[in-house]
C-alpha cells in the first residue's frame, strides 16, 4: 500500500476492514466466499451506526485485499453501498470566527486557529507544520504531504506571521524538548507534533465560551476561510489550489 502512495491513515483503515471481517466469522478471510463477504457487509450496514464514508472505505479496503493481495476477482460484483448524505457545512461568519479566536486564551491554540482560518489548512496540516515550512520572505507556508500525499503552498498573511512570531517568542522557544529546531512548531507534551484530538477539544471549548451554537468542529474554520474568500471575490480555481482539492468539483460542491 505504501508503494501505491496510500497514506498511513488509509492503510490503517484498510487493515482494520480485513480484521473486522476475520473477527466476524473467526476464519481466515482468504477462505471466505463471495456470499459470506456480502453478508458481512450487509450485516455491518444494518446493525451498526456507521458513517457512510467509513462503510465505503471498508468496501475499498476489502476490494484491495482480495484483488491486490490475494489476486482474486471475487469482489468484482456490485457490493452494497451506503449513500453518503450531501450535507453542506454550517458556515461561521467572520465575526463568529473572531469571537472563537478571542475566546481562546492559550496562545498556542489561538495561533493554530488563526492559521487554520487564515490559510484554509486542514487540522492535521496545521498540527504537523515545521519551522522550515514557514517562508516569511515569500509570505508563504509549505504544506508537505497534505491529503492525497500532495504538497502545496498557501498564503502567510502579515497577521499570521506576527502571531507565529509572538507564539514562538513567548511559548515555543521556551518549551522543553529534545527536538531539532527545524521540527514541529506546535508540540505536545511528548515533544512530538500536537495531536489533532487536543486541537479539536480546545476548539469545542472556545466555541462554547464564545456562545456559538452552530454545528461543526474545528474544520469549520477551513470552510469559513473558503466561503469568505469566495464572497470577497477570489477566483474559484485559486481557492481550489489553496485548499488542496484534487478537483474543482469538490470546491464547487461545498462553496458554490
Question: What kind of feature is each model-predicted range?
Answer:
Residues 1-256:
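Conserved catalytic core of the tyrosine transesterase superfamily
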